[in-house]
A protein has these predicted regions:
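A glycine- and small-residue-enriched flexible loop/hinge signal that marks low-structured segments
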Residues: 4-184
Length: 187
């Protein structure tokens, strides 16, 4: 509850909470989905292998980062997958809306246990690192959405699509609230 109360006061695009427990993840997911529906917030959260499948456009489930060794400063150090969610949040927040995160280089990874079936992981709504052509890269940039409907197609599983839609919606809502509401007569 304290986390959600704090989130209501912040404006963010991507949130990483390495220490979040199952109840916290559920509370954050519920808040993000409700806030998006009411056009109050447009954020997304990244978690490492949450206990329950989120099945949400708002949640990115990082997976496949066991025995992770990273080198950020010239020294190799061990990190948990949960700690690495912060780096992924930074990557996603820093990308242009014209670029997908798929195959983004992860130069800091020295070694990592890679999942054997990256397509199955992506189809299950998991964002994973890959090792291709001698380099670590992000796999298919997907969120945790797996349940598709007539109005929610496979396009909504792509991080870039959801982020672009959120950017457009947030710009429209912000412009309306800041430049029109209370400034013009409604006849």
């Amino acid at each position: 509850a304290d986390t959600v109360a704090l989130l209501k006061k912040l404006r963010f695009n991507y949130l990483a909470m390495p220490a979040a427990d199952a109840a916290g993840i559920t509370a954050i997911k519920d808040y993000l989905e409700k806030a998006r529906k009411s056009l109050d917030a447009f954020g997304k959260a990244i978690f490492y292998k949450p206990d329950t499948e989120a099945d949400s456009q708002r949640i990115i489930e990082l997976d496949g980062c066991e025995n992770l060794k990273l080198n950020f400063t010239g020294t190799e150090e061990s990190y948990t997958g949960a700690e690495y969610t912060c780096r992924i949040a930074g990557i996603l927040a820093g990308l242009s809306d014209t670029i997908s995160a798929t195959y983004t280089k992860l130069d800091e990874i020295v070694s990592c246990d890679i999942l054997e079936d990256p397509d199955a992981a992506a189809d299950a709504g998991h964002l994973i690192p890959l090792f291709k052509n001698g380099e670590y890269k992000l796999g298919r940039a997907v969120n945790s959405l797996t349940t598709l409907t007539d109005g929610v197609t496979a396009d909504f599983q792509k991080i870039r699509i959801v982020s672009t839609l959120d950017l457009i919606a947030e710009d429209i809502v912000t412009t309306f609230r800041d430049s029109y509401v209370g400034k013009y007569v409604n006849d």
